[in-house]
UniProtKB/Swiss-Prot annotation:
Catalysed reactions listed for this entry: epsilon-(gamma-L-glutamyl)-L-lysine = 5-oxo-L-proline + L-lysine
Gene: ggact.1
Family: Belongs to the gamma-glutamylcyclotransferase family.
UniProt protein name: Gamma-glutamylaminecyclotransferase A
Organism, scientific name: Danio rerio
Annotated CDD domains: GGCT_like
Length: 161
């Protein structure tokens, strides 16, 4: 009986690591962009920069609204390979991002294959916020591989390849 109590005391002091989830950001949540502060706000949860990456397959990333926010259209095989950043987030941050990205109404969180830009160019899987609910005319808009609202090429991952 004493051994069981000691065992329970030992295990009650162990802090299990937070659930870690990879998320690929390609627009306003990237470092240096207008909503990056949301990823660094610990009241939303935890997020840690992992590396720069690009989509394995091309996707159309378009600027389709007057606000000039990027939309990654969930149409793999069309458009360009999109560059962005992979963050490791906890469940609280993922829940916040779902709400922030108006998931599932505006964006949908889906899994995507990525190519890491540093090292051997390994592949990685991550969640991304893309949309399948868009005006069909958006497919006729110009596509981009990099989003940078500041116009500063130092604020994107392409230069780190």
């Amino acid at each position: 009986m004493i051994a069981i109590h000691i065992l329970l005391l030992v295990f009650s002091n162990i802090v299990l690591p937070a659930l870690c989830i990879n998320v690929f950001v390609y627009g306003t949540l990237k470092k240096g962009q207008s909503n990056y502060h949301e990823l660094t706000n610990t009241t939303h949860g935890q997020a840690e920069f992992i590396t720069c990456a690009r989509t394995k397959d091309p996707y159309p990333m378009v600027i389709a609204t007057k606000d000039k926010f990027p939309f990654l259209l969930n149409v793999p095989g069309s458009g360009q390979q999109v560059y962005g950043e992979i963050y490791n987030v906890d469940q609280n941050m993922l829940d916040f991002l779902d709400e922030f990205e108006e998931c599932p109404d505006l964006y949908q969180r889906t899994s995507i294959q990525l190519k890491i830009l540093k090292g051997n160019g390994d592949s990685e899987e991550a969640f991304v916020y893309s949309t399948s609910t868009f005006d069909p005319d958006w497919l006729n808009k110009p596509t981009f591989s990099v989003y940078d609202a500041t116009g500063d090429p130092g604020n994107n991952c392409v230069s780190r390849e």
